[in-house]
Regions:
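Short, solvent-exposed loop/turn elements at domain surfaces
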Residues: 30, 39-46, 269-270, 325-326, ...
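An active-site-proximal structural segment forming one wall of the substrate-binding cleft
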Residues: 75-102, 117-148, 156-197, 226
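Extended, alpha-helix-rich binding/interface surfaces that flank or overlap catalytic cores
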Residues: 314, 321-389
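Alpha-helix-centered segments that form part of catalytic cores
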Residues: 67-96, 361-381, 436-449
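Glycine-rich, proline-tolerant flexible connector loops at the mouths of alpha/beta enzymes
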Residues: 108-119
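Extracellular glycoside hydrolase catalytic/binding regions
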Residues: 7-14, 173-323, 331-340
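Extracytoplasmic
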Residues: 369-547
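N-terminal carbohydrate-binding accessory modules
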Residues: 1-99
Length: 547
């Protein structure tokens, strides 16, 4: 798999080849990247304002900065914000970590004047060009994502709509201007091979607004036609409704060189969570892209994303950077006193113009990459590289047990392994739907005598320690192999429950270990490539709170 995600595979125009994406050399390529959420389309929760805050979209943020600091300050604030949020240092860091692509969510108001007449914004395209140039210099493909269409496409705050109405599908002017924007993007970037593809609409039509699904299908037809009149080479990415989790719009293949994109949050990290999309991929003979995902514990990241890649599905992690965030790859610290701004957004006292400017200046300074908190455990988990803790139930796709029986959690029931609750864990207090959201890691793998199971990780430096977390009641012996080579053995005494260093691993770009139970049975809780331990971020619900 390593060669499919390596940055050395970033070469030439990407294209669709059946259910695969291939690069300019005809080699299979799996996008593995991050998204610049909050850069060109701000969201309140990414400023640590909390869910449900009135100030939750760019047009309201613009009003907020004016209210706090005055028009003169506000006029200069947004250029500084965009100059600082994504810099060349960010791009270099993303490439150095080993990602191969970025997704740029775009608000139409960055590139197109919010006026009845069609008028493009030169400075917006210059900013986009600058980022694309940096990506090309550093070997990162760029997915252009229309996150906020003219008038809004979602029916929520995330598209910078005025009032949570998807006017793209109601007002003809919004519809035509959005098509013209895509024509302009195609004209500008048709010859840029580093542009991976065009993500036509982010998460269209949620909730009651799905009644416009037929109009969404028409828009996709019209938009593909408009782009193909100008650009016949770039891939086109198509998303479904309901946060890109509903496949109802996929009644046909919209373009031969298109990719089906879905988004995944709060799902079980198991094949069952991907099955609907894999069936769709097979039906239309098109590749899949997990175009947005995140918000969980590192163990969930490494379980879900490696599974996606092993199923032939590219992954994009949301977001790269966010304010005061526990489990982001990169977190800009909230300034001391930031709660004064947050309190004002919730109806509290105005901090005063001078104090507000002071806080916002520090906010801008903190978002420079060199001032951000880098969370190596999150990055390691997303990339499944040392140091990383892999839950026992996150075994490789294709590993097959002998003695398993279906479990009541519908978790990897086709694997042939027995999966059960860890000792001392009780999930009866959870509503049935929440097992996938907050407590899937209460499950563990039972490895019985005569069974083996495989785990893969990337970028293993020489001498990386291997730790096994397991317990047994009657005692067990475990052999660990790399290929046919026996690396080490582990003996567990009766009633043993331990985390043991087993051996040191050889250097490898990609390393697959096979663990074989040669005597007895054991509960295999985790395999640790390096000295990573269980994350202490708490439950999913706790993770949702900012620092």
């Amino acid at each position: 798999m390593f060669e499919k995600i390596s940055r050395s595979a970033v070469s030439g125009f990407l294209a669709v080849d059946g259910r695969r994406i291939i690069n300019g050399r005809g080699e299979e390529f799996l996008p593995l990247g991050v998204a610049f959420g909050n850069w060109l389309l701000c969201e309140g929760n990414m400023w640590a304002f909390g869910e449900g805050n009135y100030y939750d979209r760019p047009r309201r943020f613009e009003a907020l900065i004016r209210e706090l600091c005055g028009s003169v300050y506000a006029d200069g604030f947004w250029k500084r914000f965009r100059d600082n949020f994504v810099t060349e240092d960010d791009i270099k860091a993303i490439a150095a970590y080993g990602f191969n692509s970025v997704r740029i969510p775009i608000n139409s108001r960055i590139l197109l004047e919010d006026e009845p007449k069609l008028s493009f914004i030169k400075e917006g395209f210059e900013m986009l060009d600058r980022c694309i140039d940096w990506c090309e210099e550093n070997g990162l493909y760029v997915f252009l994502d229309l996150h906020g269409a003219v008038g809004g496409q979602t029916g929520t705050h995330i598209d910078d709509s005025i009032n949570n109405i998807p006017r793209l599908f109601i007002d003809e002017n919004c519809y035509e201007k959005t098509l013209e924007l895509w024509r302009e993007l195609a004209r500008r970037y048709r010859d840029r091979w580093i542009v991976a593809g065009y993500d036509l609409l982010n998460e269209p039509l949620s909730g009651e607004h799905k009644r416009y699904t037929d109009r969404l299908s028409r828009f996709y037809d019209d938009c593909v036609r408009a782009i193909r009149e100008i650009d016949g080479r770039h891939m086109i990415i198509i998303e479904g409704t309901d946060g890109a989790s509903n496949s109802a719009v996929f009644t046909k293949k919209f373009d031969e060189n298109s990719v089906i994109s879905f988004h995944m949050y709060r799902k079980m990290p198991c094949e069952e969570s991907f099955s609907e999309w894999l069936e769709l991929s097979q039906k239309f003979n098109l590749p899949l892209w997990l175009g947005e995902t995140g918000r969980g514990r590192p163990e969930w990241f490494t379980a879900s994303y490696t599974m996606a890649l092993q199923l032939g599905i590219g992954v994009n992690f949301w977001p790269w950077k966010r304010t005061a965030w526990k489990v982001g790859a990169c977190s800009n610290p909230a300034p001391d006193g930031w709660e004064e701004i947050v309190a004002y957004t919730r109806g509290g006292k105005h901090p005063g113009a001078q104090r507000s400017r002071q806080l916002l200046d520090k906010f801008l300074e903190n978002m420079l990459y060199q001032n951000c908190d880098k969370r190596e455990d999150v990055i390691n988990a997303v990339l499944r590289r040392a140091n990383v803790r892999v839950p026992g139930i996150a075994f490789d796709v294709g590993s097959t047990g002998k003695f398993g029986k279906p479990n009541s959690y519908n978790f990897r029931n086709c694997s042939g392994y027995e999966i059960e609750l860890k000792k001392g864990r009780n999930l009866e207090w959870l509503p049935s739907m929440d097992i996938c959201e907050v407590a899937w890691d209460a499950l563990t793998l039972i490895l019985s005598e005569g069974e083996s199971v495989c785990y893969t990780a990337m970028n293993i430096p020489d001498g990386t320690p291997l730790f096994i977390e397991a317990e047994t009641e009657s005692g067990a012996d475990l052999n660990i192999y790399s290929g046919d080579k026996l690396l080490s053995s582990l003996t567990l005494a009766p009633n043993d429950n331990a985390r043991r260093k087993v051996c040191e691993l050889p250097t490898a770009d990609e390393l697959t270990l096979k663990l074989e139970a040669v005597r007895g049975s054991l509960r295999l809780h985790a395999v640790c490539f390096g000295d990573a331990e269980e994350s202490n971020y708490g439950s999913f619900l706790e993770i949702e709170l900012p620092l």
